[in-house]
Each structure stands twice: as C-alpha cells, then as structure tokens.
C-alpha cells in the first residue's frame, strides 16, 4: 500500500491531514510529552517510539500489519456510532475482538518467528523486527484500552434501557443464586480440573483463546526468606473454563434478561476445588498463541504431506504465547511467573477493565431478544446475462451466453445448480474443481460426492493449507477420496488460491465444456456476505485455458503460456505491470485510460 507525500507544514486539526497520520493512531497519546520527562521509566520506550515514527514518515509504504490495525480502528468507529442500535454496536465490538485475536495469532506470531529464531526482516514501513514489534504492541494496547473504555462508558449503560443486564453474582436474587449454584454443581464442577505447577508438576499446556483462572494458594509453616521477613509457601495452579460451556448463564426475568458471565459463576464457587487450602488470589486471564506455521515441503512422493499438516495443527495448539489478557485485579506473583515462563515483556500483558473476552458477545447477539435486529440481506437481483434469478436448465442457459455474478447482490444458486445438475446428469463425463474453504454441511461437497458415487470422474484440488480450515479440509477431502474422487491436497511449495470449476458434458456430436471462474470460495454461506465476482461461461477460449490449468495442478503439464488466463506466481505480476503501464501510456497520449481493480490487499512494492 503506497503512502502518498503530504505537506509536513500543515496546521490542519483534521487528524487525517496531518503528516503520517495514516499511522497516527499507532503511537501512544501524549507521546511527545512523555518523551520530555527524562525521569519517566517509559523514557527509553518513548524514545524508541519517536525514532520508529520518524522512520515510518520517510517510508513510501505502509505495512500490512499497521494497515490491519487501522482497519480495526474503522470497525471500532462503527461501534462508536451512537445512531446505531445496541445490537449493531455490540456486534462491531465482537468483530474487533475476533480480528485482534487473529492479528496476534498470525501477524504477531509470524513476527515472533523472526525474533525468537534470530532471523532478520525489515517491514514495509522501514522498521526492523524488534522496534516494529514494539510499535505494534503499543498501538494494540491503545486500541484495546479505547475498546474497553467504549464498552464501559457508552455501550454497557445501554443494556438496562434495552431490557438487558450483564450481571455479577451479587446482582442475582437469592433464588437465582441457588439456581446457578445447582447448575454449577451438576454441570460445571465435574468438568473442572485444577492443574498445579510446582517442583513435582510440570507447567501445564494451557489452551489459547479460552478463559483460565490462575490460582495462587498458600500453605505450610512460615519460613524465613530474609532478615525480618518470612512467608509461607506459594503454589500456582490453573483452572481452564471448558470451551464447550456457554459463555453466559441466561436468566429470563419478567422485566429483563440477565446474562451472568460463566467466569463469575465459577469464581464464586472456586473454593470447592481447593478444600482445606487457603487461596491467596484468583486471576482470570486469556492467552493467544502463535498460529503461523511454515511447512517443510518436498517434491518427494515419500513425504506424507497430510501427516505433516496434521502435525503442524497439533503444534499450533502449543505455539508460542504472543499475548496475555488479564483482569485489572490480578496477582503480580502469578503474572511474573507467566512472563518468565513464556518469555514475554510487561508490554505484552493487556490489562482489561471490563469483561475479558469480547468475542463472547456473539452469544448475547444470538439471543431471541435480538432476533428482529439481525441484518437482512438485500433482495437478490438477476445477474448480467439473465433476465430472471430463476434458472431452468443451467446448461441451456449457459449456452445462450456468459453470466457475470456479483455476490452477494446476485445469488450464488446458479453455481450450486451447475454442480448439482452436473452430478445427476447422465451425460456429464467429468467435474474438476479447486476448493479452498467450504461451508459446513456443504451442498458443493455433497454434489461432488454424489457425482463420484454415480461413476463420474471427479478431480478435486482441496487446498489443505487454507489457514485455520486445515483440519476441516483434510476431513472433507478424505470423504471425497473415499467416495472415489481424485483428490490433490495441494501443490508443494505453493498455496492454490484460485477458484475454478469445469464440467465436461457429452452432447452427442461433440463434448462441451462449462466453466465457472471466481474470486470467492465455493462456500454458499460466505457468498451471502462477501463481495466477489464470478463468471459462468462456455467460451472455448477460456475453457481451453482452464483445461490446461487443471492439467498443470493434477499432473505434470507445463504449458508455455495461456491465451487468456493470468496465473501466479508464473506471470501475473509482469502482466499486471504491463497493463498498468499501458494505461499510463494511453493517458499520456491523450487516449481513454483508466484502471478499475478489486483487490483484498496490495503488498507487492513493484506493482
């Protein structure tokens, strides 16, 4: 992403007109004032931050990580919007939390891969790995603080007027307290396991993105630790809240709906897990782990690619800790032990003033109280090439001309219809498709299974390296393989992100090829939300290229060029640059010129 030159002498108060202000939210407020306070313990950090900011101002590019955080800031703006309903504002807060989880899992995880192993990298913004990490942590800390301030000061006060109560145990009536205690004893208590850490027990493997109680207990006789000072032995143990428990216990009163955070219920009953033991402190916290991994891939067919993926998925569960979120009232003794154990700095600790995990708001948003506020998709309109959204015979329809689909405004149904009709059509000889992310209970996968069971040749490139969908993709790919599909689990050294479908049909005098090309996944759920383009075509100039492409990914074909397809990593970069240059030349020559480009992100500096 290119940062344009700006007038550094501007006196405008508009934050977006200030020099480098595309990155202004990334530095702490009053950072210049702190810098002048030489006695301030943050002096070194502030000096480093100033130097980092100066480097960024000179850079021509903005890094993807800083851009990601800026995007989250815009999502938070939606939660700030007082014209929106409580439902919408709470939803956008939940989205920012999910996004930040992914940021610390992937982007910070990737950065730690360099820092921990002494590898060098320079970010697009011009910063090396350590100062860049400091910059990211600082910006994320400020963002997190503002997010919690917004919830406590502006959004939580809206709960009562909307008939809701986010309760503590003390807010419950005596009868309600008895009800939740019964629920704890019958359902929760049997699921909880205290995991102690001492000289006879190793440090437990704690799960990422789950709520955990760190419990410090004391016991035994006092022992002298220094002159005039003695203390009793301390032990640390951990109690993980099971992920399959609902995040809130819901009580429906006549006048309001009460949401009791499950951690408050457990905290109230925690002593029963430590009978005859004195609890010094309980601290609720949550960790994020590195989820970014690189595969050591080989062309050697002896290498079991799927087993390697499975191993990496297991490793991800125990990846390096990249962030600790902790409640405001916490044990410094426990925190110190965790910092040492996970090789973290104090700046990696995110102290929260409100409920620890905002992703839990999704449970509140799914409550029937909000049923009428769920966003309604706009009515679908006929795509270009069709007079109606109703399609009879998809093959006959495609023969009449190309169909351009713009999702979610155009229905995804024509694509599903092509596959489902192909699966059941006795004249269809073969189906070839690339899959990246599919929905749960996928109609796409069901159609492919049905086609294979009916004896059709079905080739599927199922990209098992689709991040966080690896497990599901392996499971679905195995089903297809068992049904008789020819399944490729990916190409060594590459991630196949293309979305292509080809149906080969015997039409008596000739064989016809029907194709679909898309920017979006073959996923009927996300097609209702994500903006993507797709093309249904029988144009032989395109279908011949697609046939060549499938020969490349399923076999050993190496065509010198395609007539109309542009592929990466072979020639996409050069072709795009050539096309951009052509438009520049046309403009200089006074000819009609312009570029319309739909992209997810732009990271290639040359482009």
Residue ranges and their predicted role:
Residues 2-5, 19-595, 604:
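N-terminal localization/anchoring segments of enzymes in phospholipid and broader phosphate metabolism
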Residues 9-15, 34:
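Asparagine/serine/threonine-enriched low-complexity, disordered tracts
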């Amino acid at each position: 992403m290119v940062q344009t030159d700006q007038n550094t002498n501007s006196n405008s108060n508009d934050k977006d007109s200030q020099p480098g202000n595309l990155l202004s939210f990334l530095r702490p407020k009053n950072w210049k004032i702190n810098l002048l306070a030489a006695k301030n313990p943050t002096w070194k950090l502030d000096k480093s931050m100033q130097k980092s900011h100066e480097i960024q101002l000179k850079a021509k590019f903005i890094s993807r990580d800083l851009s990601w955080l800026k995007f989250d800031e815009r999502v938070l703006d939606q939660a700030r919007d007082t014209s929106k309903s409580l439902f919408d504002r709470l939803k956008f807060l939940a989205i920012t939390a999910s996004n930040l989880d992914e940021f610390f899992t992937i982007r910070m995880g990737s950065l730690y891969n360099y820092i921990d192993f002494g590898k060098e990298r320079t970010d697009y913004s011009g910063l090396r790995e350590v100062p860049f990490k400091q910059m990211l942590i600082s910006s994320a800390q400020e963002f997190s603080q503002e997010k919690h301030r917004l919830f406590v000061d502006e959004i939580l006060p809206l709960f009562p007027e909307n008939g809701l109560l986010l309760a503590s145990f003390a807010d419950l009536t005596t009868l309600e307290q008895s009800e939740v205690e019964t629920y704890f004893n019958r359902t929760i208590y049997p699921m909880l396991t205290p995991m102690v850490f001492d000289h006879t027990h190793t440090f437990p493997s704690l799960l990422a993105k789950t709520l955990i109680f760190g419990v410090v207990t004391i016991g035994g006789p006092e022992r002298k630790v220094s002159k005039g000072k003695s203390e009793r032995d301390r032990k640390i143990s951990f109690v993980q809240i099971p992920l399959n428990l609902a995040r809130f216990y819901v009580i429906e009163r006549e006048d309001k709906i009460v949401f009791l955070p499950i951690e408050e219920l457990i905290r109230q009953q925690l002593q029963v897990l430590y009978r005859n033991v004195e609890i010094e402190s309980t601290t609720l916290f949550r960790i994020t782990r590195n989820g970014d991994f690189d595969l050591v891939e080989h062309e050697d067919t002896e290498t079991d690619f799927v087993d390697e993926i499975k191993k990496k998925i297991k490793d991800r569960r125990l990846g390096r800790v990249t962030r600790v979120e902790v409640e405001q009232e916490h044990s410094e003794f426990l925190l110190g032990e965790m910092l040492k154990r996970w090789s973290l700095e104090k700046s990696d600790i995110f102290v929260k003033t409100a409920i620890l995990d905002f992703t839990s708001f999704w449970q509140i948003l799914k409550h029937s109280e909000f049923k009428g506020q769920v966003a309604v998709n706009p009515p679908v309109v006929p795509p270009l090439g069709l007079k109606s959204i109703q399609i009879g015979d998809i093959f006959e329809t495609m023969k009449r001309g190309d169909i351009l689909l713009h999702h979610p405004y155009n229905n995804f149904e024509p694509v599903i219809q092509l596959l489902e009709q192909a699966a059941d059509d006795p004249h269809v000889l073969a189906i070839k498709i690339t899959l990246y992310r599919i929905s749960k209970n996928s109609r796409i996968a069901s159609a492919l299974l049905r086609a294979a069971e009916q004896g059709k040749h079905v080739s599927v490139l199922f990209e098992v390296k689709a991040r966080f969908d690896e497990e599901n993709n392996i499971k679905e790919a195995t089903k297809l393989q068992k049904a008789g599909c020819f399944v490729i689990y990916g190409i060594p050294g590459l991630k196949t992100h293309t979305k292509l479908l080809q149906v080969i049909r015997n039409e008596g005098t000739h064989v016809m090829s029907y194709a679909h090309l898309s920017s979006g996944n073959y996923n009927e759920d996300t097609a209702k939300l994500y903006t993507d383009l797709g093309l249904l075509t029988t144009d032989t100039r395109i279908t011949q290229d697609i046939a060549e492409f499938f020969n490349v990914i399923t076999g050993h074909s190496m065509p010198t060029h395609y007539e109309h397809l542009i592929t990466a990593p072979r020639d996409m970069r050069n072709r795009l640059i050539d096309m951009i240059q052509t438009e520049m030349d046309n403009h200089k020559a006074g000819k009609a010129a312009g570029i319309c480009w739909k992209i997810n992100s732009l990271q290639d500096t040359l482009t």
